[in-house]
């Protein structure tokens, strides 16, 4: 039986590169992965993925966060064969699809980000 809480449970993080948290990179998969670990969330892990995608979208009144016919087909593909593999490694070799097309965008180099967090190195 799925573990679907009776309330809209969400996991969030200040995972941005700013003066409050200069180590972030806006990686929602990392937020979900850390949430599962830190909050000791259990099977079925797929139910808890909603806590970082469709649950926040619902709270904001957005029709996003789920794949659906005619939707934008924004998703992440990984080599993981199951949820334990997905959650035990960062999956840095993932493929990001935007509107169904593989994105070739790469994260900026750290040199490009120098000074953005408001802290000197």
Region roles according to the model:
Residues 1-78:
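His/Asp/Glu-enriched, well-ordered alpha-helical/loop segment
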Residues 46-121:
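Active-site microenvironment of metallo-dependent hydrolases
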């Amino acid at each position: 039986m799925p573990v679907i809480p009776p309330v809209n449970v969400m996991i969030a993080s200040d995972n941005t590169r700013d003066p409050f948290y200069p180590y972030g990179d806006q990686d929602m998969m990392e937020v979900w992965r850390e949430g599962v670990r830190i909050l000791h969330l259990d099977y079925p892990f797929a139910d808890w993925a909603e806590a970082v995608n469709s649950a926040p979208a619902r709270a904001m009144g957005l029709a996003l966060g789920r794949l659906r016919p005619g939707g934008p087909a924004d998703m992440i593909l990984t080599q993981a064969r199951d949820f334990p593999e997905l959650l035990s490694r960062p999956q840095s070799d993932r493929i990001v699809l935007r509107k169904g097309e593989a994105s070739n965008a790469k994260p900026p180099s750290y040199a490009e980000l120098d000074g953005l967090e408001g802290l000197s190195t």
